[in-house]
Amino acid sequence: MADTQYILPNDIGVSSLDCREAFRLLSPTERLYAHHLSRAAWYGGLAVLLQTSPEAPYIYALLSRLFRAQDPDQLRQHALAEGLTEEEYQAFLVYAAGVYSNMGNYKSFGDTKFVPNLPKDKLGRVILGSKAAQQRPEEVRDLWQTCGDLMFSLEPRLRHLGLGKEGVTTYFSGDCTMEDAKLAQDFLDSQNLSAYNTRLFKVVGQEGKSHYEVRLASVLNTDPALDSELTSKLKRYEFQGNHFQVTRGDYAPILQKVVEHLEKAKAYAANSHQEQMLAQYVESFTQGSIEAHKRGSRFWIQDKGPIVESYIGFIESYRDPFGSRGEFEGFVAMVNKAMSAKFERLVASAEQLLKELPWPLAFEKDKFLTPDFTSLDVLTFAGSGIPAGINIPNYDDLRQTEGFKNVSLGNVLAVAYAAKREKLTFLEEEDKDLYIRWKGPSFDVQVGLHELLGHGSGKLFVQDEKGAFNFDKETVINPETGEQIQSWYRSGETWDSKFSTIASSYEECRAESVGLYLCLNPQVLEIFGFEGADAEDVIYVNWLNMVRAGLLALEFYTPEAANWRQAHMQARFVILRVLLEAGEGLVTVTPTTGSDGRPDARVRLDRSKIRSVGRPALERFLRRLQVLKSTGDVVAGRALYEGYAAVTDAPPECFLTLRDTVLLRKESRKLIVQPNTRLEGSEVQLVEYEASAAGLIRSFCERFPEDGPELEEVLIQLAAADARFWRNQAQEAPPGQA
């Protein structure tokens, strides 16, 4: 059997997303709006398969054909007859559910490959003897031959997502390196093109020169007759001695489906903001224009407090090894009014609370743009995973001048972050009951502060294309050096493009730190309804949760490559290091032996020292993070962040050794089963599924009732068209991992 790092256990937690009550309260028109937006999101989410690994689209197509012909119960009888045990068949169901849940065969949280936990020959017998194989023998056999080996392979280079010899990514062709990624970013900056909706393909010509294709995601291809703001950029370029060509049409048939349902949703929009937003999204996905998506996002920001909230596009750049390309995601959700009222009170206090942050006013935005902050019950979240909260859009220029929205996903928090006592690792017994009682409420506070005042705070110092500065060069002083500002962002540079590989994690660390820092404020806790001893418990559990998460984070560190695979977890480890460095017994991490005789560890936080020792340490660290971000000082920012993020076996903590303990006692993230919406006549029905691997599989089998087989064919064709870019990738192992 495979290494436990690379399998999903048979007893993995599976929860259903509950949005029945929120959906019931929608009007018929709102339901139709939500339905078509959900359809657009689910179709678009299929692009994630093509953004993950070369084999993911084939695995998805194979599983879908298998379970369409026989549902999980019917296939079980066949599998047992073929000699599988109940445990082996369950392992296959869990694997299939994992592929659907992550939209690929790499975990969305941690970027680690997962493989089926049963022998390959047994699974092969089940697949080749299945009803699907009887109906279409050649197709099923070809799919199994194409993806069977890769499905199971744990060749060193295939274990994690990464660039070059560090791993697998389909944002770049297999021979691209970090140097190619940097060169491409310089090229994109020179043409004022965003990387968000692009992939990079490299071919080395006979003359030894590299030829790069920058391919934009769009319905349209490169036909110059189809004029748009982008047409002039679709051509060949010479750049620093290399050939570049900008093309478009990536994921075209998938995005065509997205556009069709966005057009249908427009008929049920509640106001002109929503209509104009959808029109711009249609333009963006049709043409491949990020500028159109920005315009749509501007209307989205202006659409305050809608009953049905949604966002769709190439959004988060966590999984691009370079940190610039966005993964497709789309969500549709309904407002939870009671919780939203608390967040609205937090927004009302935000301007006052921003002044509490530990940097000078010159480092804060010139004007606080009052954002929307709602608690939502998710109906649909298509992509590779579901977060607990979101602060979007990610476009720096919009965030600085137009604002943003914050959302907390209430029904996701309710199921994904629920804690069971027996599963609580690394805590003292006396902390466990307190932790269970206050984990949920403290996390609501942390998510609120993290999104609104973490991601929502801070100014970037920019010099525009005309040479004008958005800060006073003569009077603004760097509080870390006592001198005038020496560095800033030039026109075309963004936070992501400048800080690239550390940008996501650094920003998550800044937002998490703001949450810890401001949760000490009594006014914040009163907003959420906590006073006195309860307020102190919320603070303690919030800080305790963070330092425990810092230890759990070691699961997401790869020692062989000395890199982190998950931005949020790296951020939490950095915060743990900062609080350990503060000393005075504030935080201790001690190796122990568990009651089962195996290695264990205990995290302790001295609650009497949170304000006296923890707060000043966090204050100093937060100020440095913000100053280096504002000034675009990537050299000092990288040195600071990577210094704290380094994992060594230096005493007293011996983190590399502790990592083995963390892996020994790790718990897999829950899989979440989402409902479907179904149009029956003019009415939209909500279809729910049981909380099990089989239920999750059924939800996906019923997700595309009109065109499932056609979509699988499209995915196979799109994957096959680019397959040459990743041939022979597995054989090249990274150094030290052969």
Curated annotation (Swiss-Prot):
Alphabetized InterPro entries for the sequence: Dipeptidyl-peptase3 (IPR005317), Peptidase_M49 (IPR039461)
Annotated disulfide bonds: none
Group of enzyme by EC: hydrolase
Gene Ontology, cellular component aspect: cytosol
Similarity annotation: Belongs to the peptidase M49 family.
Pfam families given in the database record: Peptidase_M49
Record-listed N-acetylalanine modification sites: 2
Binding-site list for Zn(2+): 450, 455, 508
Any GO BP: proteolysis
GO molecular function: aminopeptidase activity; dipeptidyl-peptidase activity; metalloexopeptidase activity; zinc ion binding
Active site: 451
Domain of life, per lineage: Eukaryota
Cofactor remark: Binds 1 zinc ion per subunit.
Gene3D superfamilies per record: 3.30.540.30
Compartments where found: Cytoplasm, Cytosol
Function: Cleaves and degrades bioactive peptides, including angiotensin, Leu-enkephalin and Met-enkephalin. Also cleaves Arg-Arg-beta-naphthylamide (in vitro).
Keyword line: Acetylation, Aminopeptidase, Cytoplasm, Hydrolase, Metal-binding, Metalloprotease, Protease, Zinc
Catalytic reactions of this protein: Release of an N-terminal dipeptide from a peptide comprising four or more residues, with broad specificity. Also acts on dipeptidyl 2-naphthylamides
Listed EC numbers: 3.4.14.4
Required cofactor names: Zn(2+)
Protein name as catalogued: Dipeptidyl peptidase 3
